[in-house]
Amino acid sequence: MPPPPPPPRRPALGAAGASKEENVYIPNFISKRPFYAVDEGENTDYLEHQRIQKKEKDTGWYDRGKTLGPAATKYRKGACENCGAMTHKVKDCLSRPRAKGAKWTGRDIKADELVQDVRMGWDAKRDRWNGYDAREYQAVVEDYNKMEELRKEMQAKAAAESGKAIEDGDHYAETSDMSKHQPTSTRQLRLREDTAKYLLNLDLDSAKYDPKTRTIVDAGATNDKTAELYAEQGFLRQSGDAAEFEKAQRYAWEAQEKGGDTSLHLQANPTAGSYMRKKLKEEEDAKREERERQLREKYGGEETKVLPDAIRQMAVTESERYVEYDEIGLIKGGPKGVARSKYKEDIFHNNHTSVWGSWWSDFKWGYACCHSFVKNSYCTGEEGKAAWEAAERQRTGSGLLEPAADAEVDGAREEERKASEAETAAAAKEKAKKRTAEQMIGDVTEAELDEYRRKRTNTDDPMAQLLGRDELVT
């Protein structure tokens, strides 16, 4: 009896293979398709409207530079005035601005571009590499390969001329870019054959090394190799052959940068580098001596070769004197000179003997030599001063006033005159008290009455208080 057939396989659940049978335990408001959901008709998944609808991302890009067809032969109305294309205006034209556009010349009319409707998603709009064609980088690779071929040809040519093979050197020597402009302290931060200081003494029982923090306590010991290395840390050697070593290293780097020659490596081939440096120095000295000899033959100067004492004293010489400068660049404790103004001083114009602003009067600046208020005027000297004083006296009326000394003399004379007049008046008054018989019998005459009226003081007269005074009212 044959075995029974296997049970049928249950269909896969999901968006593609969903169950055709409805689940009675799913509520109606979930399983019912809303009115706005699109019904494809053939879909058997009654819960499709509840599943995540994954759509393919549109990452398309327009074809840059694609045209609709061949270019027109003459200018068309409404086209770009610069290039003649119908798909854009002159303000949106990306072609080179012409002195005379295609509208006026009718030449070199560009074809119409294909305007594509590119609708991208959120990620596609923000993709910096969207639309990039990797084939564009092929031009960079080709340029690099051409330069590499030229470099190899030059090396082969140089090897044929010199008669020795040029080694390529290790990868580090070719790819490292140690510029001569880079500080020496940066290039020599760490040597590859250097040993870390915490590896010099790994004795766990020693008080010098702390295994927990992996540090050496108190900078190591005092009389061993570790202490010597710590003493040299951060110290730039300037004695012995340090300067010569720096020159040799710099020469090797410059030779590699200029010609790509790695045979003058300082550590790999120090003898060749030293020989080439010595040879180059001898050639430079020979050229300099030859140049000096030619100049002496042409212009002479054997007798003036020795520098004069004045020039020799002006030369900068080394000194051990310690000099300290302040924040503005002056020597501390040095003599303080008079600060010079940035403006020109003691420069007199137009025959003046003083500068403008050396005299002040009536809220005005002027020249003290001639009392002139006009800037850049011609100096008149003492005559100008006298003219100015006369003008001031005429303007203020000070010339009508008496000098102080004359006023004192006149005051004394006036007092004497008043005293004499007072005595005369007193004597006349005493005499006037004695009336004659005629005066006692007779009446007042017309002349006496008129004199009385003339001499009578009117109290209402505003000038009455000034009577008897000889002072000038100003």
UniProtKB/Swiss-Prot annotation:
Zinc finger (CCHC-type) stretch: 78-95
Subcellular location: Nucleus
GO molecular function, one term: pre-mRNA 3'-splice site binding
Keyword flag Metal-binding: yes
Pfam families, sorted: Slu7
GO cellular component, one term: spliceosomal complex
Basic and acidic residues bias: start-end ranges: 280-296, 410-421
The keyword Transmembrane appears for this protein: no
Principal place of residence: nucleus
Subunit structure: Associated with the spliceosome.
Described purpose of this protein according to its UniProt entry: Involved in pre-mRNA splicing.
Protein known as: Pre-mRNA-splicing factor SLU7
Source organism (scientific name): Pyricularia oryzae (strain 70-15 / ATCC MYA-4617 / FGSC 8958) (Rice blast fungus)
